[in-house]
Amino acid sequence: MDSKYIQKTLSAITEQITKNAAVQKVLDNKFVKEHKYAAAAATVGLGVVAATTIVKAVNCEGKRYNYDAIPNLSFDDESIYDVATIGAGPSGSVLGYYLAREGRKVALLEKKVFPRDKYCGDAVATMAQDILREMGVMKELVDEDLGHFAQNGGFVSPNGNSFIGNSAKELKRDAKYNRGAVIAVKRIVLDEKVAKAAKRMGADLKENTTVENATFDRSTGVWTINCVDSEDNTKKIVYRARVLVCADGSPSNAARQLGYVHTEPNGICSRAYVKNNTTFRYDGVVFYPPSLLPGYCAIIREARDELNYLAYIIPGGKVTNDDLSKYHHQYMTEDPFISAALGPNPDIERMKAAPLRLGGIKKSYDDHLLIVGDAAGFIDPLTGEGIQYAMEGSRLASLALIQAFNERDLSHQSLKRYQDFWMAKFGHEFSMSMTMSLFLYRFPIVLDAAASLIEKRGSRFLAEWAAVMTGVKPKTWFLRPDVGPLIVLEIFGECFRRVFQGKKQIKKLD
């Protein structure tokens, strides 16, 4: 806040105090004059109490929402939805699926008409795979050849160290994983499959519906959601719901309009599908060009032998979101590894881009309100992975809402358990991911050493690495005594090689 504004405000307050007769009477009191310090301390204490009360009121903290004081509250009015989600992507539809399964009346308000595209890396990791199996979607994807499980892959470090291995084969040897590390599914396919699964379960899917605004009536405990037909803006539609869920993606338009999110998305990613007439023969490789750190590029194999070339810009480095197009196209021809993988004349689509909100938001709940998925920043700052956290977060949100409805308590104190759930499951990892991301930007030699270590230890070690990067294992794995010291030793070895063996000769991927 501007210091001149503060001084001006304080001057105005002082002026009003000096003019106030009641205040002057207190200041002229004999006790106050004789005990100035005690009076000052009491005044400060009262000020702190008043400020705390105001903050609690603003943040909706403190006393539990009193439902007995809401004269018109009803949990039985069938004209009112139990829950309405703004957005029917993976987060909104997964939430709708689980709530509908429990008999709750849910409206999924989707701006577009399925099938509709979204831009990301298309990599669906383990937690999301479990949910897709439960929804029956995974069987559809496999039966219709719409997803591709990664069988082999690796990464290329900033200095050009690389290793490609068969992590999937190693994961299958370990019964506790019981699924592939990643399956690539195009979002135009995945989102429709998940939304239709929610609809089959009983959720009311409202496509072609743009939400203009939503208002909460505290006297009835009901949201009024004003919408228009996305193709015919003159056609007005109104829905009413007891709980509003913001599931409208990284821009978080609904949550921003309601005052719960105050920042722009802090990352961005590109996507370009490539017809597989290239020399690339792996399922997935991550490239760490030095100029893009802490971001990265990747090439992922999709179903039916198509590739997905993408670049992620993650906050903390020199590059900004505005640099995405420049680096996306530059690496295609100038990076020795990416250009070799794509070949001289790749049949590649025009670059698409999507914003990213990374690291989670501070508060994702309020009275009769939840914020889920990308809108809540459920994207890992180290890997850019978001689909599995969006889906798992919504599964956890359904548990919180089911319990809240059973208790007939939709207060923020009741719905806070949702925040507790996702923080305990994956949110606590986000701060470590951000720290690691910044650390790798400052010390890229760590990635060089890691690639060398994986090359020495083989596919089993790569599988463990993949388990960490896909959320199966916590990132504290890097601190284990059988991992951390080895990376440190490899860093010393990398330094030695650079000093005594000179500049590394660039090798292409085999």
Curated annotation (Swiss-Prot):
PANTHER family associated with the record: CONDITIONED MEDIUM FACTOR RECEPTOR 1, GERANYLGERANYL DIPHOSPHATE REDUCTASE
Keyword match Transmembrane: yes
Cytoplasmic domain ranges by topology: 1-36
Description of the deletion phenotype: Null cells show a 50% decrease of the CMF binding and a loss of CMF-induced G protein-independent gene expression.
Name of the protein: Conditioned medium factor receptor 1
GO molecular function terms listed in the Swiss-Prot or TrEMBL record: FAD binding
InterPro entries: FAD-bd (IPR002938), FAD/NAD-bd_sf (IPR036188), Geranylgeranyl_reductase (IPR050407)
Residues passing through the membrane, by range: 37-55
Keyword tags: Membrane, Receptor, Transmembrane, Transmembrane helix
Membrane association type: Single-pass membrane protein
CC per GO annotation: membrane
Residue spans, topological domain Extracellular: 56-510
Function: Receptor for cmfA, that appears to mediate the G-independent cmfA signal transduction.
Statement: the UniProt record of this protein carries the keyword Hydrolase: no
Location(s), subcellular: Membrane
